[in-house]
């Protein structure tokens, strides 16, 4: 349930949207030919939706209920590099995703923990991979 009046909620949404866009250097995606802005917008809106949830609630991440406060904290740590990483992962995913919203929430939640290992694996593959 959303507390307050509709204008209050809209203002809160706009404030979170601006904050998230600032964190991820949103304007840098405007001219990025590798990233579709609609994809970035979808991620931003999904994060905004979570930011509006009450802290005492839970969000399902990879099938596990996580405290909203922890998910919000994780989302607020995401930056431009994390969003690029998520978009790269999405583009290279070849398996069918049944619930795209759940998949994106999990990807956003895990991005800060998995980005370093992902790029290490990519470099190792490029340097020492199958030839």
Question: Where does each model-flagged region fall?
Answer:
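Electrostatic interaction modules used in gene-expression and signaling proteins
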Residues: 1-131
């Amino acid at each position: 349930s959303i507390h307050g009046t509709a204008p209050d909620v809209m203002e809160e949404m706009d404030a979170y949207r601006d904050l998230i866009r600032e964190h991820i250097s949103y304007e840098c995606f405007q001219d990025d030919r590798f990233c579709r802005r609609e994809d970035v917008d979808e991620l931003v809106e999904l994060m905004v939706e979570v930011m509006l949830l009450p802290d005492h609630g839970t969000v399902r991440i990879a099938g596990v209920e996580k405290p909203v406060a922890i998910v919000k904290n994780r989302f607020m740590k995401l930056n431009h590099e994390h969003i690029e990483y998520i978009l790269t992962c999405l583009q290279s995913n070849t398996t069918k995703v049944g619930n795209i919203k759940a998949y994106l929430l999990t990807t956003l939640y895990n991005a800060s923990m998995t980005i370093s290992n992902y790029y290490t694996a990519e470099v190792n593959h490029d340097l020492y991979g199958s030839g």
